[in-house]
Regions:
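Hydrophobic beta-strand scaffold residues
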Residues: 62, 182-183
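RNase H-like two-metal-ion nuclease catalytic core shared by retroviral integrases
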Residues: 73-74, 161-163, 169-176, 183-205, ...
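Active-site beta-loop-alpha junctions of metal-dependent nucleic acid enzymes
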Residues: 113, 131-153, 168
Length: 247
């Protein structure tokens, strides 16, 4: 009986180690559901209930808002650039065929200075296709991010944004027309319409945690690493728990 009990305790320790390593590997971001999938890929089969108990015994819990630019812009000079929510009216066949990008800004205060990041994600492929950073939340920064994305991934069929002033502008509208890209805008105060990039920003902020001790250069490096990690290593539930670039 003593030997059997010892074996059970050793096996339990191995389970704890496996769960903890998977938890740490992905920066403490995932809970029992995602950890179960990650462990299964390593031929370790534990129930969600068991994983939940182990996390509790280890005294750890998954992370899981966000500061951002104003997402609704109204001006008599630019209101004619406001677009409808075209994406909501696409058929499933069109969504599966078209390359649609979702883009938006997020901000972080580092050493008392605001740094804005404009990012763009592929709705279908879940790849962060491009981004740009700057000290101001401007149309120019949005256009720089878009140029970076097109350079790396070509021209999309449609772009989704909110109604922020950066997107309700003459220059951004002209860029969409020049490239023949359809522009879909969220309804006012309805971030769910542009949920794809919204979800990415939420995941990034939660998984990176506090950044109190970072300087600007280090923060930019951290963002660069996270985007690499997200595209190449982080499992994505809608892609069968494989990273976007491996799907």
């Amino acid at each position: 009986m003593r030997r059997d009990g010892a074996r059970r305790r050793v096996y339990k320790a191995e389970q704890k180690q496996a769960v903890y390593e998977a938890f740490v590997e992905h920066h403490g971001s995932f809970g029992r559901r995602m950890l179960k999938r990650i462990l299964e890929r390593k031929s370790i089969h534990l129930s969600e209930y068991k994983i939940s108990k182990i996390l509790k015994e280890l005294g750890v819990s998954p992370k899981y808002g966000r500061k951002r630019c104003k997402n609704v812009h109204t001006s008599k000079n630019t209101e004619h650039y406001i677009q409808q929510n075209l994406y909501a009216h696409l058929t499933d066949e069109e969504k599966s065929r078209m390359e649609v990008w979702s883009m938006d800004f997020t901000e972080e205060k580092i050493n008392g200075k605001k740094i804005y990041t404009c990012g763009i994600i592929s709705v279908k492929r879940k790849i962060l296709v491009g981004y740009a950073q700057g000290s101001r939340c401007t149309t120019a920064l949005a256009m720089e991010a878009f140029a970076n994305a097109m350079l790396a991934h070509g021209i999309p069929d449609m772009v989704m944004t909110d109604r922020g002033s950066q997107f309700v502008s003459k220059d951004f509208h002209a860029m969409m027309e020049d490239w023949g890209i359809k522009h879909s805008m969220s309804r006012p105060y309805t971030p769910v319409d542009n949920r794809f990039i919204e979800t990415f920003w939420k995941s990034m902020k939660v998984e990176l945690g506090k950044k109190d001790l970072l300087n600007e250069a280090t923060y930019r490096m951290v963002i660069e690493y996270y985007i690499f990690y997200y595209n190449n290593l982080r499992p994505h539930s809608t892609l069968g728990y494989t990273p976007p670039l491996a799907a």
